[in-house]
Amino acid sequence: MADQVLSRTLNQKFDTVFEEVTHQETLNLLNRNDLKLFCLDIETNQFNYDPLVEFLEDNLGMYVFSRAELDELVDAGKDRTVALKAVRRLIKTGNPGEKGTGSELGEILDYCFFEHVLEAPKILSKYEQVTAGGTYKAQSEGVHLLSVGKAGAPAYQLVYLSLIHIS
């Protein structure tokens, strides 16, 4: 992979929370593709959610705040309160899990998977899109920068995730 022009924001504890499921399945598409499946750790026949909760607490601020906002918080000595400030912002935007506000668990997990699995740094999270300019109509779950070039020949693609809810 080519050198990254943008660093990833995700705390690198991903592999302690999610385990990749090995399989032989493919999507049978013409273009290069990968199908990756992950699951949480299982203890006594039940999912262990504690590591997931801790992982999300550690990364919530990175999802909610832009890099510039995070830098401002660190410079002001507020780096220990980033997660609390992130929770407060999410609550202001809408009820936890409310569709379209950027506070749904799936939207936050999308950010985590894009950053870790694709190694595609966040440009804008769903939450940042939703709150930018006061608009609440973001159709993308996030915008990430994917490196597709080789060493010495950098190339990048913008990656969007858009989900269609069918009732």
Language-model features and meaning:
Residues Y127, I164-I166:
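Conserved small/polar residues in nucleotide/adenosyl-binding loops
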Residues F114, S140-G152, Q157-L163:
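Conserved catalytic cores of phosphodiester-cleaving nucleases, focusing on short active-site segments
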Residues T101, L105-A138, H144-S147:
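Extended, Lys/Arg-enriched charged tracts that mediate electrostatic binding to polyanionic substrates
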Residues A2-V82:
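A structured, charge-rich N-terminal accessory region that forms the first stable segment of a protein
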Residues C39-E43, F47, G97, T101, ...:
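Generic amphipathic alpha-helical segments used as scaffolds and interaction surfaces in large
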